[in-house]
Design a protein with these regions (language model features):
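Peri-transmembrane interface segments
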Residues: 11-22, 233-236, 240-283
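A short beta-strand structural signal in non-transmembrane regions
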Residues: 60, 156, 215-238, 253
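A structural signal for hydrophobic secondary-structure junctions
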Residues: 75-76, 80-215
Length: 283
């Protein structure tokens, strides 16, 4: 527009040549297109990574304060009354209990470390249904064990496993415990840090492996309605929860997805700098 105004308003004999105007217009258009595409790609990539991290562990987790940063967790008591109280927060969309147990898969030719994550009927499986390649994501239980498991495509390929195979899993505590589980679903998120780690099964099974009471779990996952209110919601729940230990004296610890994955979110933050660099260079 500006280029055309300059061209039309120039005095006779001093008009800028039409090719120069066209080149300027095309250059500006290309620059804007490149800028929009670059920014869109970066923003979309950040959103995709964040959504996958949230898909594996929700926006906020409540666990045992004394638990180390590992998947061999100490339990906390989470009964129905606590679940109802957490669901009453305005920004909380969904609440679900989970338990984890590190172990190993062994086949005739190989073995692989993994984390068995137990979930129950309340688990929101939308994320895994979206990334399911084969089989099904069953409704797992907190009151019975079906000996079924959902595994990632990358782990299945590494161990040469397929849908319907039975796998031998081993867990070390005071002694070695073994469980044979049937693969009923295969998922793929292309987020290798988690794909190479997690198998999903019944909450009941994992609690039995951990020797826990029925209302003891590794923690609670909370999905919120507005990501922009993540920090605010985290501190609100923490203020109400941190000072109230369970019946065994275990203290609760509330952490959000950014606190649980600081390296990944710091890296995503660096991408914002790239956006500004692109904008400055294009201007």
């Amino acid at each position: 527009f500006i280029a055309l105004r300059i061209y039309r308003n120039s005095e006779p004999g001093k008009q800028v040549s039409r090719p120069a105007v066209l080149i300027a217009m095309v250059g500006i258009a290309l620059g804007l297109a490149v800028m929009i595409i670059a920014v869109s790609v970066i923003v979309g990539f950040k959103s995709e990574v964040r959504d996958k991290i949230v898909g594996f562990g929700a926006h906020i987790q409540i666990g045992n304060l004394d638990a180390a940063r590992s998947y061999e967790t100490r339990p906390v008591v989470v009964g129905d009354s606590m679940m109802a109280a957490l669901s009453d927060y305005p920004e909380v969309k969904h609440v679900q209990r989970y338990s984890t147990k590190p172990g190993m898969i062994k086949t005739a030719d190989a073995f692989q470390g993994m984390v068995l994550k137990g979930v129950g009927q309340e688990y929101d499986s939308t994320f895994f249904h979206r990334h399911l390649l084969e089989g099904e994501f069953p409704q797992f239980s907190d009151s019975a064990s079906s000996n079924r498991v959902v595994i990632s495509k990358s782990l299945a390929n590494k161990l040469q496993l397929k849908l319907g195979d039975k796998i031998d899993t081993y867990f070390i505590q005071d002694d070695v415990r073994a469980r044979r589980l049937k693969i009923v679903g295969i998922y793929q998120t292309n987020f290798s840090e988690y794909d190479n780690l997690f198998l999903l099964t019944d909450l009941y099974l994992v609690n039995r492996l951990n020797n826990w009471e029925p209302d003891q779990v590794s923690g609670v996952e909370l999905e919120i309605r507005d990501y922009d209110k993540l920090e605010e919601t985290t501190y609100e729940i923490a203020a109400d929860t941190d000072e109230n230990p369970d019946r065994y004296g275990a203290e609760y610890c509330v952490r959000n997805v950014e606190q649980l994955n600081p390296q990944i979110f710091a890296w995503l933050g660096i991408l914002d700098v790239n956006i500004w660099v692109i904008l400055i260079l294009m201007i």
